[in-house]
Every structure is written in C-alpha cells, then in structure tokens.
Amino acid sequence: MADWSAEQYLKFEDERTRPARDLLAQVWLDDPRRVVDIGCGPGNSTELLVKRWPQAKVTGVDNSADMLRQARERLPGHNFIEANIAHWVAPVGTEVVFANAVFQWVPNHLKHMQRLLGALAPGGVLAVQMPDNLDELSHILMREVAFQEPWREQLSTAAELRDTLPKPGVYYDALRPLCSRLEIWHTVYNHALDSAAAIVEWVRGTGLRPFVDPLELPERKAYLAAYTARIAAAYPPQADGKVLLRFPRIFIVASK
C-alpha cells in the first residue's frame, strides 16, 4: 500500500481517539518510567500517554513517514521511531506497550503480542485495542464492490491484508499463561456522522486503503462512486439526518 495519510486519518480525530482514551483508562500503572506507543500514527494516542504520565519517557513507533512527521510536529521534543512492529524489539525496562488500532494490520499478531508481553519489565502492561469490523457493512461492501468488474482482477488480494480477528477466548488462552492479570472486553461504538459520504471519508483513512490505493485515478473515482452508493443504501439517516457508523472493537489489557 501507499504511505498512510495523517491528514485523512485525522479528519475524524475525536472519534478515532475515543477508544484510545477508553483503553488508557483501564491501564492500572500509576508511575511507569518507560512507555512505548506502537502504531502511534499522528501522535493523538501518544499525546494521551504524555499527559497521563508526564514523568515517563514516552516513545512513539510507526512505519509511516507521514504519520511520524505529524506526530513530531504535534509533540516536539519527544522520541519517535520509524519501524515495522513485526520486527521491533521493546527496549529493556519498558513498562507499558500501548497498541491502539495497530495489531489488526500485523500478520500473526497474536505471536507478536506474546513476544512483547514477555519482553516487558515485571509488572509491566501490554494494552491493546483493535477494530473488529470486517463483518460490518462498511467492510462487506468494500469487498462486494471489489469483486465486481472492472476491479475484480486488480483488487483480488485487497481483502487479504487484514484477517478476521480471533474470538476473545483465543486471546485469553494465548496470553493468560504469560501474565498475572488479564482483562478482555468487546464493545460496539455507534459514531454519529453527518452523512453516508462521511462514512466513506472515515474508511478512506484506514480500511478502504487496500482497495483504492492500487487503482489509478479514473478507476479509483469509479470504485468510490459505486461504494458510496452502496453505503448510502446500507446506512439510512436517523431522524436528525445523521447516520450511525457501527464500529465493534476488542480491548486487551495484560499485566506481566
């Protein structure tokens, strides 16, 4: 895929940051000294960590140059590293690894969660939030349009960049032997957006990228028009004209 766009991602900054706030509220450490925000994106989640633990050394890690550029502008003086999370190694003494909306993009992510949990300092916390929305209409319709002509051949592998998440019990069995405390919950957000077009703008920053990035501009416009029409039919307006984007997410907080 092309590099992520911080500008596109931040069009819905408040809504995207809310799950990070909810995840952070359940991290029970009061005074960690070394905190890492993996998949830090444009720094919106990193900023929460800096405010929660001003005394800590907070480092952001991401594989997108554009996201890191925005993060450095947002939090000058803080350390940001460009790295692939699948190969990144937590520094010795890391007490918190915060991973908001990133592991769903990492192949075999459960293995890497186990690896990072094992690398934490004693009593350290791995805090994870992942979208669990591949079975939502917003994503089903991406695939349906992609399977049609003229996009079928070019987008034949687009859906393979993300796998359906395992059930909570799978995470529990894999992580419980490695930790002293484990909390897992699954919730559904209903984001009130201005229109069906706003839903399309939201997913263009994340889930729609594998479907539109490979296309040239004319094909991309045609794909987006077909997708937008289906979204408009699938998400009727509420009484006030807003549309509700249903968005399931899974949360995991594990203490070593």
From Swiss-Prot:
Belongs to the methyltransferase superfamily. Tam family. It is an enzyme of class 2 (transferase). Its main location: cytoplasm. It comes from the Bacteria. One of its GO terms (molecular function) is trans-aconitate 2-methyltransferase activity. InterPro entries: Methyltransf_25, SAM-dependent_MTases_sf, Trans-aconitate_MeTrfase, Trans_acon_MeTrfase_C. Catalyzes the S-adenosylmethionine monomethyl esterification of trans-aconitate. It comes from Rhodopseudomonas palustris (strain BisA53). One of its GO terms (biological process) is methylation. Its EC number is 2.1.1.144. GO terms for cellular component: cytoplasm. This is Trans-aconitate 2-methyltransferase. It catalyses: trans-aconitate + S-adenosyl-L-methionine = (E)-3-(methoxycarbonyl)pent-2-enedioate + S-adenosyl-L-homocysteine. It is found in: Cytoplasm. Keywords: Cytoplasm, Methyltransferase, S-adenosyl-L-methionine, Transferase.
